[in-house]
Each structure stands twice: as structure tokens, then as C-alpha cells.
């Protein structure tokens, strides 16, 4: 997971 959210969420890849 990018941050703590699911991969398909609005979380950035970095």
C-alpha cells in the first residue's frame, strides 16, 4: 500500500 489506504484508493504512489 502507498500510504495506509488500498492501492485502488486516492493515495499517491509515492
From Swiss-Prot:
One of its GO terms (cellular component) is chloroplast thylakoid. The keyword Plastid applies. It is found in: Plastid, Chloroplast thylakoid. Keywords: Chloroplast, Plastid, Thylakoid. Transmembrane segments: none annotated. On the 2D-gel the determined pI of this protein is: 5.5, its MW is: 27.4 kDa. This is Unknown protein from spot 115 of 2D-PAGE of thylakoid. It comes from Pisum sativum.
Amino acid at each position: 500500500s502507498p500510504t495506509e489506504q488500498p492501492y485502488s484508493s486516492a493515495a499517491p504512489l509515492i
